Amino acid sequence: YAKASGDKVQVTRRELEYMLACETTGRERFVILGLLSQHFKTALWSNEKDERLTHVTHNGYADYYKQMPYIFHNAKINLNIALRAIQTGIPLRVLDIMGCGGFVLTSYREEIAEHFVNGEECVIYENLEDMYAKAKFYLEHEEERQRIAISGFEKVRRDFTFDNALRRILG
């Protein structure tokens, strides 16, 4: 992310913004995982292990094609904490989770709210307190959580096919 200029390193404004967004998102994810793991069984699939998250079960890398669909489908709650640098659009992870029939609790993005009914097809949180309250609620209400996961799966299967995407693009 840096451009070498002689013995100096120059970082563009855009590169700096991206690095800060990654750092901010990393800290946000750390706080969320720390909070949730103090109250609920919390598992993380990632190459990176943070030793400070002592109550989080670290499961290492999950293969996108072979393991992730199973994980997404069987997790009680799949968290999507979107990278702060991504300001618009529906994160692919949200569609992946819903396409596997998983329940997704996601940070707010305008396009998610435009395309999905909050509380019907997915659950969107606004801040840390809202995320915790919704995680607690849906862990205690399994039938409601499963109903939302099924509705989200049906929506993705119906509206987010390659054919539909091509029609919108070529429209």
Q: Residue spans of the language-model regions?
A:
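Non-transmembrane alpha-helical segments in soluble domains
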Residues: 33-37, 69, 136, 153, ...
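Short alpha-helical segment that forms part of, or immediately flanks, the ligand-binding pocket
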Residues: 69, 92-99, 113
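Glycine-centered loop/turn motifs
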Residues: 118-119
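Catalytic phosphate/metal-binding cores of nucleic-acid and nucleotide-processing enzymes, i.e., regions
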Residues: 128-131, 152
